[in-house]
Amino acid sequence: MSQGSVTFRDVAIDFSQEEWKWLQPAQRDLYRCVMLENYGHLVSLGLSISKPDVVSLLEQGKEPWLGKREVKRDLFSVSESSGEIKDFSPKNVIYDDSSQYLIMERILSQGPVYSSFKGGWKCKDHTEMLQENQGCIRKVTVSHQEALAQHMNISTVERPYGCHECGKTFGRRFSLVLHQRTHTGEKPYACKECGKTFSQISNLVKHQMIHTGKKPHECKDCNKTFSYLSFLIEHQRTHTGEKPYECTECGKAFSRASNLTRHQRIHIGKKQYICRKCGKAFSSGSELIRHQITHTGEKPYECIECGKAFRRFSHLTRHQSIHTTKTPYECNECRKAFRCHSFLIKHQRIHAGEKLYECDECGKVFTWHASLIQHTKSHTGEKPYACAECDKAFSRSFSLILHQRTHTGEKPYVCKVCNKSFSWSSNLAKHQRTHTLDNPYEYENSFNYHSFLTEHQ
């Protein structure tokens, strides 16, 4: 599919006023984000399209339903009966808000998660087709949680577009086209800057932010900017304290749907991502990837200013503030500003009456005066500790002691399993993994291991 053949109707969705009232605030925010961003994606690619009415309404903060279109549907109506029959409406359903396809497939198309259903559920036998090929909601009588979940997953939305490769069906032709690219490998959207290609418009637009650095959405509370409106909305919850995503098991609430999803794995004990190096299990793939870097030593995030590399993107972001004069975190007491939020928190302890020592150069705060003196050397470049062997100088005495081992050959760190010695504790820690990884059971049952354990205890 060429870029010119994509229209806003392919990636848009309409809600009636009746449907809109069932959506929770977080779902309405998600809808606004997706609609405005998808329109922005098409415009940024130079497609000649006029601004739809629904986009204008959303930009003005108005309700998005269009015209006076009447939709005669009795959504999720329930017949009361004896026994444990509960009210059944969208507010009882826990949706997986972690994906934007929640809105793009009309809320129900991904299948709701019925984790909160405890008793029987009874719905009226009735079927009505929605207008404009937008779906089908079928109501049947069911008496068990699994039966209802299975029925709703199959029947809630009409999916007339089927993939010939795998049989998967979709409610929209455009969704089928996007899916088929997973089989063909087609990537029709190319970046004009670097030539990298993508299968979806949204991925291209996200990638182009790397080249432009454009972050048009600004937080009014702290002036922090974001590439996407959805990121700004999530960030604003750090100021308001809003936590719209609640765990049905324990009642704990979260500001992000992804955090709720991660938390819910605690209740089911699901850790399907296992590290092949050490066997440690993780609840999410991102946690596994972050962990694996500790084995490889890889530092994929590089600062374009000085070339310094980092294991985590958050560490790179924190480092980059060194190169800029931007200090977004301001103290309400004295109006002093800081690069990092953690620096502001430490600084505020001074106003609380704690005796802390603050660096005049960068504002960093220390609990001990000696730590401040040591830190100031990083600004002055002073290195008072010199090696008598090679005249190499260091800012810390401990760094000199470590360096001198390269001359003396001292190796104070000894492995309790094989008696191999090392100059650095970090090298010993790395070495000890070879015992636990190669044969963990033999290591745990060995005499040296138990003597080491006894000594440690």
Curated annotation (Swiss-Prot):
Residues of the KRAB domain: 6-77
GO MF term list: DNA-binding transcription factor activity, RNA polymerase II-specific; DNA-binding transcription repressor activity, RNA polymerase II-specific; RNA polymerase II cis-regulatory region sequence-specific DNA binding; sequence-specific DNA binding; sequence-specific double-stranded DNA binding; zinc ion binding
Pfam family of the protein (one): zf-C2H2_6
InterPro entries in the record: KRAB, KRAB_dom_sf, Snail/Krueppel_Znf, Znf_C2H2_sf, Znf_C2H2_type
GO cellular component: nucleus
Example GO biological process: regulation of transcription by RNA polymerase II
Residues annotated as transmembrane: none
Disulfide bonds: none
Keywords, alphabetical: DNA-binding, Metal-binding, Nucleus, Repeat, Repressor, Transcription, Transcription regulation, Zinc, Zinc-finger
Tissues expressed in: Seems ubiquitous. Seen in the heart, brain, placenta, lung, liver, skeletal muscle, kidney and pancreas.
Zinc finger extent (C2H2-type): 161-183, 189-211, 217-239, 245-267, 273-295, 301-323, 329-351, 357-379, 385-407, 413-435
Main location: nucleus
Record's subcellular location: Nucleus
Function: May be involved in transcriptional regulation as a repressor.
Family: Belongs to the krueppel C2H2-type zinc-finger protein family.
Protein name: Zinc finger protein 140
Gene: ZNF140
